[in-house]
């Protein structure tokens, strides 16, 4: 029976990718002499026969002096966030930019079971670290930073505060919600509700801004929608059973805003005639819902591209200095804020 590379990897307790790079004599590989010796001896012991075509391709690449970099992206929030319209556009930018640069994107996952995922990542990449990693979203599990440090040589994070030696690119979450608030304020709204998600810096910004402008927001209309359409719709509907809605509701993302609009409409309220609603992110659906959503546009795909460029630059240059880059956002005015009604008034 023909021995596979996977069997060699399992016998050695390392990844298949590492076995491939050792047996194909990848000159860019950094691995301990003991691990290299262990893999080579196990392959010989099992009489493993390398794929001649693959070996020839590897050799031709070396001869052409082409180094194919290996990077990944990782979310420490949840696997469901990877498929979220916001993250999916960022990932699209990462993959597009990587494809332009002879770079393989090997890892892409969320951390539903953080401990299990950490163990899997260490098993796969600790002996053969990736050239770099892009971290999406907030770092919920601080202990997993040690894992990232072991599986990737360089890191670009998209939330501030990861560490002082990694590059950062992103949008200032604490400030990006302000254009929506200021727009509603200019339209004359005095009574507000807030839809947020957990530990949400946009929510904190909204509370402080409303307080500073002496505008009201009642406790019953400060609702945790968990950043999802369904939860926001359900909780807004429950609030509407007991309380009259405020004149304007500011949501920390578009999905919660859309869920809010649906709950209002099902309860007999009109948007924006009775209640104005704004979102954040400008996901594709925002422009195509029944009441097109006023929102803050974040340049998501460009963020992914920039993160990849920064990462590749650092890998290739080996620079020590870190870079912090913030990308601006902009208000997109659509029907849900009621500006057409106010302009006529």
Language model features: what each stretch is:
Residues 62-182, 186, 239-241, 345:
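Alpha-helical recognition/docking segments in bacterial nutrient-uptake
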Residues 233, 237-345:
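Flexible loop/turn connectors
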Residues 98-110, 191-194, 207-233:
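Short beta-strand elements in bilobed, periplasmic/extracellular small-molecule ligand-binding domains
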Residues 36, 84, 88-92, 200-207:
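Short, surface-exposed alpha-helical segments at coil->helix boundaries
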Residues 127-136, 191-196, 222, 243-253, ...:
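Periplasmic-binding protein-like
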Residues 167-194, 204, 229-238, 298-316:
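Hydrophobic alpha-helical segments within soluble ligand-binding/sensing domains
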Residues 180-215, 219-220, 323-337:
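An alpha-beta-alpha
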Residues 1-62:
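N-terminal helix-turn-helix DNA-binding module of bacterial transcription factors
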């Amino acid at each position: 029976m023909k021995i596979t590379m996977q069997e060699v990897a399992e016998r050695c307790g390392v990844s298949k990718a590492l076995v491939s790079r050792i047996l194909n004599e990848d000159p860019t590989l950094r691995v301990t002499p003991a691990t290299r010796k262990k893999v080579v001896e196990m392959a010989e012991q099992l009489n493993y026969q390398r794929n001649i075509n693959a070996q020839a391709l590897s050799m031709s690449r070396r001869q052409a002096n082409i180094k194919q970099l290996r990077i990944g992206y990782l979310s420490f929030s949840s696997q469901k966030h990877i498929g979220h319209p916001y993250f999916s556009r960022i990932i699209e930018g990462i993959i597009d930019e990587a494809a332009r640069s002879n770079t393989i994107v090997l890892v892409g996952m969320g951390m539903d079971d953080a401990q299990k995922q950490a163990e899997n990542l260490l098993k796969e990449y600790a002996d053969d670290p990736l050239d770099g990693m892009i971290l999406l979203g907030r770092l919920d599990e601080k202990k997993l930073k040690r894992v990232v440090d072991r599986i990737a040589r360089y890191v670009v994070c998209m939330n501030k505060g990861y560490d002082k030696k990694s590059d950062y690119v992103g949008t200032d979450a604490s400030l990006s919600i302000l254009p929506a608030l200021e727009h509603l304020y200019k339209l004359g709204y005095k009574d507000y509700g807030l839809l947020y998600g957990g530990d949400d810096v946009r929510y904190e910004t909204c509370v402080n801004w409303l307080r500073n402008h002496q505008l009201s927001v009642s406790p019953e209309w400060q609702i945790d929608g968990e950043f999802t359409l369904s939860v926001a719709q359900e909780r807004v509907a429950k609030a509407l059973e007991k309380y009259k809605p405020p004149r304007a509701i500011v949501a920390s993302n578009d999905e919660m805003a859309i869920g809010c609009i649906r709950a209002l409409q099902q309860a007999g309220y009109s948007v924006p005639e009775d209640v104005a609603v704004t979102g954040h992110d400008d996901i594709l659906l925002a422009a195509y819902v029944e009441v097109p959503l006023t929102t803050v546009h974040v340049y998501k795909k460009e963020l992914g591209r920039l993160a990849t460029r920064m990462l590749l630059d650092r890998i290739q240059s080996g620079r020590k200095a870190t870079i912090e880059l913030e990308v601006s956002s902009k208000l997109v005015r659509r029907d849900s804020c009621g500006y057409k009604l106010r302009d006529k008034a």
